[in-house]
């Protein structure tokens, strides 16, 4: 019986062997998480499996707290672990020290972490987005020199807005050197003074597009002073460069559409503006024509003497009153002189009287001169007004060979108001003429 081992003794021996084997102290394992559970203590319990085998595993709280992602069922992971035996159950398991997502999963994890960081810094804020110029003179295109992307962009811009100059900047969009080349070409394009920059490439896997998720590339796009359109991949592909750009296009073709106006739509707009302006001018001219017709029918223009008859009467009245005032003043002075002659010796006052006469004569001359100046000013002003009114008078117009055409007491101003056999009355400078319309010819005929 002493040759038999107990279960616990065998288990301890096997555990001892595992713990002493240096090859089992730090093992790198690749697999899929299953039966994942997080204990209230903070420890993690799970299985790691592939298509053929399953290993029990656990991760202590201290190591789990250092993870930069939240493990979940189905994650493909890379593990660094120690292999040992769980004595109570007698099965071996691994104790995980480090864990990271495998392949694409790890890339997505890095992508989300960088996206969160740049979002918190404001690199994706809409407030920082620049508007795309509507009528670009120069467009820089950063993409591979060959491939569908450059062909689509080039042909679309040429068909929509051929006035825009395209500056093609050959750029590496995939591979180890692509990141630095993309940054260099963005900075170069920004220095050219172009209106818009298109950064694009065709579709691909997340690994193919990863250069456009690099932090340095995203920051180069964010810091660019020239508006940037990002057209990386297909419609379902998204990169951090899309979020940093001023606008994201689903495809390179759509980027060219966003960057340019449609020349045919512009032509339609110009034609519409031309039609609207022509209609406005015609309407304004018609309004002015009617206004002139209304003024020409005003009775004062038909009888211009009505405008200055009252002014002539007023001038004559003022002239008469002024002369009467001068005469009355003269009579008063003469009567005063006579009284003085009766009261004083005429010989003694002769010198004084002569001086008074000279003063009166001087005042009279000044008054007459002032009167004549005023009368002349009134005459000249009246003459100018009469000449201006005569120039506007229909009578003077008729002296130049024109006539006023009336049909049934209505003034005719257009051939459109006449038909054949209409009876007309022509008012000329020296009389009236009855006429009959035999034919109507318009200027457009």
From Swiss-Prot:
Q: Alphabetically list the UniProt keywords.
A: Cytoplasm, Exonuclease, Hydrolase, Nuclease
User: Which GO cellular component terms, listed alphabetically, does the Swiss-Prot or TrEMBL entry include?
Assistant: cytoplasm; exodeoxyribonuclease VII complex
Q: Name one Pfam family in it.
A: tRNA_anti_2
Does the record carry Cytoplasm as a key word? yes
Give an example GO biological process: DNA catabolic process
EC no. given is: 3.1.11.6
Principal location: cytoplasm
GO MF term set:
exodeoxyribonuclease VII activity; nucleic acid binding
Q: Which reaction does it catalyse?
A: Exonucleolytic cleavage in either 5'- to 3'- or 3'- to 5'-direction to yield nucleoside 5'-phosphates
Q: Where is the protein localized?
A: Cytoplasm
Query: How does this chain assemble?
Result: Heterooligomer composed of large and small subunits.
Query: So what family is this one in?
Result: Belongs to the XseA family.
Name under which the protein is recorded = Exodeoxyribonuclease 7 large subunit
Q: Which organism is it from?
A: Staphylococcus aureus (strain NCTC 8325 / PS 47)
Q: Which gene encodes it?
A: xseA
